[in-house]
Amino acid sequence: AFEAAVAGGIPIIKALREGLTANRIQYIAGIINGTTNYILSEMRERGLDFATALAGAQALGYAEADPTFDIEGVDAAHKLTIMCAIAFGVPMQFDRAYVEGISKLDATDIKYAEDLGYRIKLLGIARRTARGIELRVHPTLIPAKRLIASVEGAMNAVEVHGDAVGATLYYGKGAGAEPTASAVVADLVDVTRLHTADPEHRVPHLAFQPQSLSDTPVLPIEEVTSGYYLRLRVADVTGVLADVTRLLADAGISIDAMLQREAEQIAGDGQTDVVIITHET
């Protein structure tokens, strides 16, 4: 009975709780906040800075007068916590989630990411690993060829991987009167149906009976392995690039891709940007 709380009109809760019941869910990755996705789309497509894109979202009613919960990733983390509980059979642990929003993103980073073949989206990611569960919301570079990277505007999408079905993608409106009403009616029907069954044979709201919940730990972000995006503003002098790569190598960090801009394209003050994407570390 949480359909209206997550991803608007997308029936992702029923998919996780019932449609994919034969699967051991491996991970979930979702664009689950329409406000931030709209802002990022405007920054990429029109080259707007964050403040201008946010003002546009507020003018259209996509963002609240106080947009903190949206732009700082809190709303997405709430939704991700519900999906994680249903997918992995763990208690809701919002306080253990790593949450980072988009307010510090620069249009320059969005352009560099695109030059390297990526798009930046605010993703909610829940992943089952041998050591525990990853539960995190943050800006993420997604290869542009992936379907979820093409989700623009205020739309939502959730990618779910199961061991039997493989990759599945759920796409639709994440907010609005009619999509939300559709989800609310689904919740009401679900609750009514549950009350016609005896407690022992009901499908629990969170898919698992309380006594069956796992105590699998949520991993702190320091224990999560991932590739990273780095943008370094450096002096445009001979040997700087070699110094940067040597420092990364000394730290055991491997470079996957690198991009360097001419100094005159940056500030004309003898500085340049070096953009690096690392391998998982």
Question: Predicted regions span which residues?
Answer:
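Low-complexity, glycine/alanine/valine/leucine- and proline-rich hydrophobic stretches
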Residues: 138-163, 177-178, 245, 249-269
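Predominant activation on well-ordered alpha-helical scaffold segments within soluble catalytic domains
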Residues: 13-17, 37-41, 51-58, 77-85, ...
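Glycine-rich phosphate/pyrophosphate-binding beta-alpha loops
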Residues: 166-168, 172-178
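Structured core elements
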Residues: 27, 39, 121-122, 136, ...
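A conserved regulatory-domain signal marking ACT and ACT-like small-molecule sensing domains
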Residues: 183, 188-281
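Short helix-capping/linker segments at secondary-structure and domain boundaries
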Residues: 46-49, 87-94, 192-197
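Substrate-binding/catalytic subdomain of NAD(P)-dependent oxidoreductase enzymes
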Residues: 52-150, 155-157, 176
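Rossmann-like NAD(P)H-binding beta-loop-alpha module
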Residues: 2-63, 70-75, 82
